[in-house]
Regions:
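Bulky hydrophobic/aromatic content
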Residues: 1-57
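Short, charged N-terminal helix-start/capping segments
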Residues: 1-15, 69-72, 109-111, 116
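Short, solvent-exposed secondary-structure boundary motifs
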Residues: 33-34, 58-67, 94, 121, ...
Length: 166
């Protein structure tokens, strides 16, 4: 979460707190991301460079697997939280959805954070948690009718989005 989003959330919280009696007039989305109960433990592990162990269930596999991870950071995308890191012996950074992560154990085993890893940079060309499988992204041109175009202009699909024809 970047600093501006934190400030925006704080401003919204303060506005709602100060405006007494407005609850009947405001309807917020009721969904709460699953797995947020592990945020504190994961943040503690990331900050202190502790390995974590957990059980993980993929949606497309019925078997629950045991994982050991060197956690590098957290990412939020569309009300879902993910932990990023490398598993023991693996060479690539993987993402694990917190809503499918169970039995979190923050170990006392330390790991070295790679000096060349940058979370922001690793997701620069991605959409959510899905990154390109090529070194450079491809250019994609989308076309919308005038009404849908207004929505796309007001809430970009991607931070690199450009408007070619207005």
């Amino acid at each position: 979460m970047n600093f501006q989003r934190m400030i925006d959330a704080f401003d919204m919280f303060n506005s709602l707190n100060l405006a007494q009696g407005v609850t009947p007039y405001i309807h917020l989305e009721k969904r709460r991301p699953e797995g947020t109960d592990n945020l504190y433990g994961l943040l503690h592990a990331i900050k202190n460079r502790y390995q974590v162990k957990f059980s993980y269930e993929k949606y497309y596999e019925s078997e629950v697997t045991k994982r050991t991870l060197n956690p590098y950071g957290l990412k939020e995308f569309r009300y879902r939280w993910y932990v990023l890191g490398k598993e023991n012996g693996e060479g690539i950074v993987k993402t694990f959805a917190l809503d499918r992560l169970k039995d979190l154990d923050v170990t006392q085993t330390k790991f070295a954070f790679p000096k060349d890893y940058n979370i922001e940079e690793s997701f620069r060309h991605s959409f959510g948690i899905i990154g390109p499988n090529k070194p450079h992204p491809e250019e994609i041109i989308l076309s919308f009718n005038a009404i849908q175009g207004k929505y796309i202009k007001s809430l970009a699909l991607h931070h690199d989005q450009e408007i070619l024809v207005n």
